[in-house]
């Protein structure tokens, strides 16, 4: 099952040259959050593309293997100049209670190239996943300005606040 995201529903995307939203989405849950954030802020969008199989049931199990071992997953080379943006928002799914492997790879490649960063983490549990934010901070060599943790269950989103 996939979420459908229609770019025409988000007319403000790309209206600001100062912001960028980066995302990886296997099934569309994170893509929807990324598009909403980009539309709200006028940011441009950049999708992280894995070179591994991530689609379907086999993709689910393959991604789980990377997640369990906390391995990087090969991705396409970053094709956007990250240093030209004042603010970058990274949207990531949580896999096996940790940062998704393609986003881990992106952060490693993007180290030292991002001026200011914030995170949106999408998952199916009630956690905040500060561990994933700390890992991204370490990989990027920068401290995030904010973290939003969003639970998605049965197609409904709910922001998880600190307790």
Walk through the language-model features, giving the residues of each:
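Positions that flank functional sites
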Residues: 53
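FMN-binding flavodoxin-like domain, especially the glycine-rich phosphate-binding loop
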Residues: 1-20, 25-50, 62-163
């Amino acid at each position: 099952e996939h979420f459908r995201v229609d770019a025409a529903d988000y007319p403000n995307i790309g209206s600001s040259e100062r912001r960028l939203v980066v995302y990886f989405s296997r099934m569309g849950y994170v893509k929807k959050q990324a598009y909403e954030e980009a539309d709200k802020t006028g940011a441009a969008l950049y999708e992280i593309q894995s070179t591994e199989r991530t689609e379907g049931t086999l993709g689910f199990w393959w991604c789980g293997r990377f997640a369990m071992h906390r391995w990087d997953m090969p991705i396409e080379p970053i094709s956007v100049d990250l240093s030209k943006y004042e603010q970058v928002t990274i949207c990531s799914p949580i896999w096996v209670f940790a940062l998704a492997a393609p986003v881990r790879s992106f952060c490693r490649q993007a180290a030292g190239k991002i001026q200011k960063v914030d995170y949106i983490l999408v998952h199916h549990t009630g956690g905040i996943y500060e561990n994933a934010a700390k890992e991204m901070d370490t990989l990027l060599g920068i401290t995030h300005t904010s973290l939003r943790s969003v639970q998605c269950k049965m197609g409904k989103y709910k922001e998880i606040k600190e307790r």
